[in-house]
């Protein structure tokens, strides 16, 4: 499926992939797999790829494929408050309200579509924020996100604040 996206992303205007099959194992490091080359190519093409980190409360790793390079690892905070739950590890790049990390990842993929459109319509120069558009969008979302401390892991994560991300993009006009 990833190869199909690589081959057809221009024809069908594919810009975002919600990669949601998880292996439910705590990986502290990437696990070499057959999809790594495809993830690198998608990233190079400017296609956002993210995956949920898992729902086991791990603090020593996250599920595959979120553990892989060129795949952004999305965690969860409890809806209605900023309590990080489910898997919590330093590889998580952004947390989003959701009962499970799969729903958090779906929300961030929708946010990425909106942010990408805002960048295109506003003429925002994303190159100052990253080498690729996915890297730039992640940086924007992290820098405008709300800091959420997790006492259980000792880590601080950034929670998506789409309005602040959009305000940053449109303020640069």
Which role fits each region the language model picked out?
Residues 1-68, 99-107, 151-154:
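Substrate-binding/access-modulating region of protease and related hydrolase catalytic domains
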């Amino acid at each position: 499926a990833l190869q199909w996206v690589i081959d057809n992303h221009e024809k069908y205007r594919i810009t975002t992939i919600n990669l949601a099959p998880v292996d439910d194992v705590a990986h502290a490091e990437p696990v070499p797999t057959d999809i790594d080359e495809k993830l690198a190519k998608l990233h190079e093409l400017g296609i956002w790829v993210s995956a949920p980190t898992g729902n086991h409360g791990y603090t020593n790793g996250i599920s595959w494929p979120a553990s892989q390079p060129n795949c952004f690892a999305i965690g969860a905070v409890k809806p209605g408050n900023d309590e990080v739950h489910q898997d919590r590890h330093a590889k998580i790049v952004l947390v989003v309200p959701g009962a499970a990390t799969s729903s958090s990842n779906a929300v961030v993929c929708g946010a990425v579509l909106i942010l990408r459109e805002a960048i295109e319509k506003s003429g925002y120069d994303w190159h100052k924020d990253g080498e690729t558009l996915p890297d730039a969008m992640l940086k924007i979302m992290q820098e405008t996100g709300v800091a959420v401390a997790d006492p259980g892991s000792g880590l601080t994560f950034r929670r998506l604040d789409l309005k602040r991300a959009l305000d940053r993009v449109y303020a640069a006009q």
